[in-house]
């Protein structure tokens, strides 16, 4: 089975390319966080910090904060992309069953395939970490203590091993559910793709995790809106940022509940668009027909937009409060905005990878539409509307984290005796939504030229 697994990877590299890109970026982010952690805990760095009058713990805290936010985005993205890729190639696994492979062999082959992808992606990811580790450490050192000076970082066997283990483990765990489903795939799907529609049920493990996560969200919302501010240092209250954490927890909860929540939401709010007919009706049905992959893509889009909304709203609120209270406090927004851009781009890349995996079925769909009399221009309009449906649903979901962050941050500073200022980050949210729409439109339009050049009969022959 090892030979067949490697051959499948070689022949289906286009289908795996999006997954490899996401895993590589995740490996790079994880690697720089691990390198920073190992660096600031080295004995020579601890001694240098004490000699400079800096508490060594101050060097560790920024790295932990960044690593936490990175994990909040990276783990859901890697898990969702891994399981979506396995699900998109379920017909290939059914072919193996039809050829006589045992269920346990198919299960082992699927998980081995994902593990190999994780190993391959770690190579460019670690190279990316090698380049970004030093600037990353310099930024965090400046945030912790400007007087600390230059800290030289270096890769170690421990950081390399942990990077590989974390990336491969998360990818494989995310693929376990779809791999088990692939084992139970009827052999008839080997000769004809089953429609990807239908309501996807959440597994027991996912339900339990979602329930635990929902309780964590409720507790964090309680802290964000009711916990008193901490003592003031130089006129600035401590204990802030609880609303950001609540918003991120809610965004991850949406990813966990995506199979059950997002198709219903998409069906509900897009119902009036079906009355417009034409491309609107076809695009809506296409999105609902792919409810499984579209739910995963929309969940990751909502994660990207929600993270941007939470962080930019918090930064705008802090800056407005400082100006209104006339405080002499310097707020460094560049580093936070760079972090938001990187993690938001990763979630967007994950959504693009999930959408791109459906290119094979889209070519057949375009052929059916052309056979029914639709023109290439009509198909393009349908694709644009479908991308708008994805982004519109993600925007609706992101309104909740935006409102939570805006209200929570404003009320926190008001309870601390600061001016009540409301600064929702609407502009950055709309900008990210526009970039997401343009990117998804480009990805959805990509299969059209190939589909138009291929004869309709050749495309439909597989049906």
Predicted regions and their residues:
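Membrane transport/envelope proteins' first extracytoplasmic loop
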Residues: 1-75, 84, 155-158, 325-337
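Alpha-helical transmembrane segments, especially those used as permease/efflux helices
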Residues: 2-36, 58, 71-74, 162-175, ...
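Short cytosolic juxtamembrane segments of multi-pass membrane proteins
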Residues: 3, 185-200, 452-463
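Interfacial "coupling" helices/loops that link adjacent transmembrane helices in transporter permeases
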Residues: 12-17, 76-115, 349-391
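Selective transmembrane-helix segments that form parts of the transport pathway or gating/packing helices
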Residues: 16-20, 74, 110-128, 199-214, ...
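Small-residue-rich transmembrane alpha-helices
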Residues: 30-42, 82, 115-145, 159-184, ...
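Membrane-anchoring hydrophobic segments
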Residues: 42, 46-200
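Conserved transmembrane alpha-helices of multi-pass membrane proteins
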Residues: 50-72, 144-176, 197-212, 240, ...
């Amino acid at each position: 089975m090892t030979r067949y697994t490697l051959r499948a990877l070689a022949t289906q590299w286009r289908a795996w390319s999006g997954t490899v890109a996401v895993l590589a970026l995740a490996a790079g982010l994880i690697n720089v966080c691990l390198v920073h952690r190992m660096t600031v805990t080295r004995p020579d760095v601890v001694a240098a910090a004490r000699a400079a009058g800096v508490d060594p713990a101050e060097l560790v805290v920024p790295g932990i904060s960044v690593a936490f936010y990175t994990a909040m985005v990276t783990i859901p993205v890697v898990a969702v992309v891994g399981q979506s890729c396995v699900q998109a190639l379920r017909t290939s696994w059914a072919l193996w069953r039809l050829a006589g492979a045992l269920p346990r062999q198919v299960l082992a082959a699927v998980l081995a395939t994902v593990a190999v992808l994780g190993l391959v992606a770690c190579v460019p990811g670690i190279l990316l970490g090698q380049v970004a580790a030093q600037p990353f450490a310099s930024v965090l050192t400046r945030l912790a203590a400007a007087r600390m000076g230059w800290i030289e970082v270096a890769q170690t066997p421990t950081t390399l091993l942990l990077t590989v283990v974390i990336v491969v483990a998360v990818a494989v765990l995310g693929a376990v559910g779809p791999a088990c489903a692939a084992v139970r795939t009827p052999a008839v799907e080997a000769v004809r793709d089953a429609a990807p529609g239908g309501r996807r049920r959440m597994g027991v493990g996912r339900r339990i995790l979602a329930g635990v996560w929902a309780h964590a969200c409720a507790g964090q919302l309680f802290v964000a809106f009711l916990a008193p501010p901490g003592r003031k240092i130089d006129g600035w209250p401590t204990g802030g940022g609880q609303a950001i954490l609540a918003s991120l927890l809610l965004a991850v909860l949406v990813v966990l509940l995506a199979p059950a929540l997002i198709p219903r939401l998409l069906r509900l709010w897009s119902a009036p668009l079906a009355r417009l007919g034409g491309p609107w009706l076809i695009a809506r049905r296409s999105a609902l027909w792919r409810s499984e992959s579209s739910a995963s893509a929309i969940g990751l889009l909502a994660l990207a937009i929600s993270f941007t909304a939470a962080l930019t709203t918090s930064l705008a609120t802090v800056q407005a409060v400082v100006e209104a209270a006339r405080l002499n406090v310097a707020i460094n927004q560049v580093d936070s905005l760079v972090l938001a851009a990187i993690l938001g781009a990763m979630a967007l890349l994950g959504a693009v990878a999930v959408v791109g995996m459906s290119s094979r079925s889209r070519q057949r769909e375009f052929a059916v539409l052309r056979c029914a009399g639709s023109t290439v221009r009509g198909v393009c309009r349908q694709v644009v509307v479908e991308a708008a449906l994805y982004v519109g649903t993600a925007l609706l979901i992101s309104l909740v984290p935006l409102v939570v962050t805006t209200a929570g941050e404003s009320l926190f500073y008001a309870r601390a005796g600061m001016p009540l200022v409301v600064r929702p980050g609407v502009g950055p949210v709309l900008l990210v939504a526009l970039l997401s729409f343009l990117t998804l439109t480009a990805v959805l339009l990509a299969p059209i030229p190939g589909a138009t050049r291929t004869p309709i009969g050749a495309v439909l022959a597989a049906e």
